[in-house]
């Protein structure tokens, strides 16, 4: 199993990354919580990974910290939660907020996440409550996202595309991004603010 990669960040187009490790390009999928803390393209980064082997593909999921990967692994063990939904949950809510929702039995907040209905929210609460007690405090490694001066039109399009990939409807994603003042924001910041408005 591939548990960790260290390499040069070649591409980042949420939710996909391309990481060059000693001349081999690894295609990775990552939650937006990881995108928020990635360095600029061309910089070296260490990512913790989870490999999923299917009949038709081998998929690598990347996380900024071991704790985040641990939460993802706990999520995909919940009945009805696959890797895509697990990434959506980590992208749509901070680990601390998710923990609070589970501990307090807050199905309303959980159902606001893309792909999470009432039954899935109830299952998450029941199955994750004990697992979260066994996990160390959640957190993300202390890396910072890159900043750009002025938001390019491609940045807005990338943000909308990332929200659609997370399960939001295209018109809903566009509407949420249009409501923001996107000037001088990175793609990750646009996505984060749009998600906060939609939740």
Swiss-Prot record:
Record-given protein name: Holliday junction branch migration complex subunit RuvA
Comment text on domains: Has three domains with a flexible linker between the domains II and III and assumes an 'L' shape. Domain III is highly mobile and contacts RuvB.
Pfam families assigned: HHH_5 (PF14520), RuvA_C (PF07499), RuvA_N (PF01330)
Main localization category: cytoplasm
Gene that specifies this protein: ruvA
GO MF annotations, alphabetized: ATP binding; four-way junction DNA binding; four-way junction helicase activity
Function: The RuvA-RuvB-RuvC complex processes Holliday junction (HJ) DNA during genetic recombination and DNA repair, while the RuvA-RuvB complex plays an important role in the rescue of blocked DNA replication forks via replication fork reversal (RFR). RuvA specifically binds to HJ cruciform DNA, conferring on it an open structure. The RuvB hexamer acts as an ATP-dependent pump, pulling dsDNA into and through the RuvAB complex. HJ branch migration allows RuvC to scan DNA until it finds its consensus sequence, where it cleaves and resolves the cruciform DNA.
Compartments in which it is found: Cytoplasm
Keyword set includes DNA repair: yes
Keywords: Cytoplasm, DNA damage, DNA recombination, DNA repair, DNA-binding
Family that this chain belongs to: Belongs to the RuvA family.
Region (Domain I): 1-64
GO biological process: DNA recombination; DNA repair
Assembly behavior: Homotetramer. Forms an RuvA(8)-RuvB(12)-Holliday junction (HJ) complex. HJ DNA is sandwiched between 2 RuvA tetramers; dsDNA enters through RuvA and exits via RuvB. An RuvB hexamer assembles on each DNA strand where it exits the tetramer. Each RuvB hexamer is contacted by two RuvA subunits (via domain III) on 2 adjacent RuvB subunits; this complex drives branch migration. In the full resolvosome a probable DNA-RuvA(4)-RuvB(12)-RuvC(2) complex forms which resolves the HJ.
